[in-house]
A protein has these predicted regions:
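Conserved small-residue
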Residues: 93-190
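Short, hydrophobic/aromatic alpha-helical segments in well-folded domains
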Residues: 17, 32, 185-186, 191
């Protein structure tokens, strides 16, 4: 029906523009002190707390999927970063020999406070409340020992399993390992 080499031009709605996009904002508190004791011991302590808001994120909760276009990025994300740094340095001299010893302790923690993410069936699937770079996936609980172990375990939908394969946790206890069992796993890549 028709010429096989004919072209049909089509147009479709891409991502909507968002003229209201702004720079993200940050409110921060930094407190610190430095002290020298006995002209030999230097101590430094710093504490920080940073609240970032208006971070660009896809607004899954405010624009439904059925609208038929890619959702624009909006300033809706919120993240908190806090931590401290403590360093100590001891310096002294013995005759003509000068020396010092220095050490430090650092701690930093970030948390997604709001991400406008898609509604989830189970609370453990949300990224909000976790660290920014928190990995998500299936939680490994061991290895399949034999065929009886496979038969007595929840059904895996991602692949056919055999003895020696990784066994995953059924997070929602429905007897099936699938995308509804994805949760926060492991540690983040950043300290």
């Amino acid at each position: 029906f028709g010429d096989a080499n004919s072209n049909v031009e089509t147009y479709f709605e891409g991502t909507l523009a968002n003229p209201s996009v702004t720079w993200e904002k940050e409110r921060q508190l930094n407190v610190g002190f430095d002290a020298t004791l006995f002209r030999k011991l230097d101590i430094s302590f710093d504490f920080f707390n940073r609240d970032r808001r208006d971070i660009l994120a896809t607004p899954y909760r405010t624009i439904p999927d059925f609208v038929g276009f890619k959702k624009p990025e909006m300033n809706v994300g919120k993240v908190n970063n806090k931590g401290f740094e403590l360093t100590a340095r001891y310096a002294d001299r013995i005759n003509d020999f000068n020396y010092y010893v220095q050490g430090g302790v650092w701690y930093a923690h970030n948390e997604v406070k709001y991400n406008a993410e898609m509604l989830q069936q189970y609370s453990y699937m949300y990224r909000t409340g976790h660290r920014v770079d928190q990995p998500f996936g299936l939680q490994a609980i061991g290895f399949f020992k034999d065929q009886k172990d496979i038969d007595d375990s929840p059904q895996h939908t991602f692949m056919k399993v055999q003895p020696g394969d990784i066994k995953y946790k059924d997070m929602n206890n429905d007897g099936v390992i699938n995308e509804n069992d994805i949760c926060a796993i492991g540690y983040t890549n950043l300290p």
